[in-house]
Amino acid sequence: YWYISSQNKFKPGSSIGVAVGDTPYGPFKDALGRALVTNDMTTYAKHSWDDLDPSVFVDKDGQAWLYWGNGVCYRVKLKDDMVSLDGEIEAIDRKDASSFSGGFTEAPWIYKRQGHYYLVYASGFPESIHYSTAKSAGGKWTAQGVVMPTEKGSNTNHPGIVDFKGHSYFFYHNDALPGGHSYCRSVCVEEFVYGSDGTIPELYMTREGVKQGVGTLSPYRCTEAETIAWSEGVTSAVSAKRGVYITGIHDGDYIKVRDVDFGETGPKRFVAAASSRYHGGEMELRIDGRDGEVIGTLRIPYTGEWENWGEFATDVKSVTGVHD
C-alpha cells in the first residue's frame, strides 16, 4: 500500500490517495479510482492544503491508523482492507503545547517501540523535528521535545525512524547536494541510540551519516551497479535487456560500494556487463578511496549501440578483508 498526497482535479485542495501493488517496487495501481480523503472531509483547518504527508501504522492487534496533516494533525482508523476509513476523522489541535512542543506543522511519522508509541513531526518554519509519545495510537499525545533543531537547509524537514538489524536510524532531508534548494531535497540518515527510558536524543545533520553498516557485501556474487553508497557524476537509467544500469560516465566519475568482504583468499578476476556506443573506455577498480590503490583496470570496448551489452573481465590483484 502506497499512500500519497496529491492535488485533486475533481474537488478543490489537496487529497490523500492510496495505490496498491504486489511488491514494494510496484507496479502500483489506484486502489479506489478516487481519493481516500478529500479536503471537504477535513474542515478543522481553513486552508486547502491541510491533507498532506500521510503516514500509516498497523498496531500489534491488526488495527491500522492513518495520520496526516499540514497545520493540523489528523488521524483516523482504517478498515481491514486498508483502503476504507473506519469512523470519524479526528483533528488534534496543533497549538496544544501538552501534545506538541513547538506546535505541529506537518509530516507526522507514527510507530511503536518497546511499548511506547511515538509521533515524530515537523514543527515551525523553517522546520525543526519534534516528537511526542502516547500509550496508544488513538490516545492522548504527550510532548517530549526536539529531535533535530532547525538548521540551514531546505526550510522543510520531514522525519522517518526505523529499527533495522538491531540499530536505530533517523531519516530526514535537506538541500545539501549540489543544486539543492527548498524543492530539490536530498535524503539523509543518522544512527542513534535511545535512552534507557525510551527517549530520543537530540540529533544534528552531518555529511557523513551512518558510519558503520549492519553487514557486508560479497564480491563473489552479482552486485547491481545501482548498489551505491556514494557516487559522483553518474546517472541511472533503465534498459529493456538489463534493467536499471549506470550511465553518463566520464573521467573522474565514480561509484563507491561500502564494506565489501573479500575474505581470506581474495578474488582473481572482475567481471562486468557493459556497453559503449562510442569509443569505449577504461574502468579502474580502487580500494578504500577514489585515490586508493588500483587493483585492476577493466577495458570496455566499442560495442556499437547502447543495447549491445557484453560481459568483460580483467585480472585483479589479490585483496583480503573488508574494504570499500
Question: Can you say where each PLM-predicted feature lies in the sequence?
Answer:
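Carbohydrate-active catalytic/glycan-binding domains of CAZyme proteins
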Residues: 1-323
